[in-house]
Design a protein with these regions (language model features):
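Short, compact, well-ordered microdomains
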Residues: 5, 60-89
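Short, basic/aromatic beta-hairpin or loop at an interaction surface
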Residues: 1-9
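Short alpha-helix capping/helix-loop boundary micro-motifs
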Residues: 12-16
């Protein structure tokens, strides 16, 4: 198994309601596949998990400006919050 990678989840934009009141610029650092500390929206994490999994094991997104990130992950509750997941190492 690969060493867990340091990654960052960031809110890129919010265009509507959000129960957790996330706003653009909010950031959480995670290591490997651990959930962010302090609680995190389960629906949003469920959507982010495949991206975090892929990044943790070395995936690259060649169609992104930064190949070590994906910034098109949207909240499944209406799509009002868009997240970016980035491998930091």
């Amino acid at each position: 198994m690969a060493n867990p990678k340091k990654m960052r989840i960031e809110v890129v934009e919010r265009t509507g309601p959000c129960f957790y009141e996330y706003k653009a610029g909010d950031k959480w650092d995670v290591t490997g596949l651990k959930t962010p500390e302090g609680g995190f929206c389960g629906a949003a994490y469920h959507t982010l998990f495949p991206v975090l999994f892929a990044l943790n094991f070395g995936a690259k997104y060649p169609f992104m400006k930064d190949v070590d990130s994906l910034d098109t992950v949207v909240c499944p509750d209406g799509g009002y919050v868009r997240f970016k997941a980035k491998r930091m190492e």
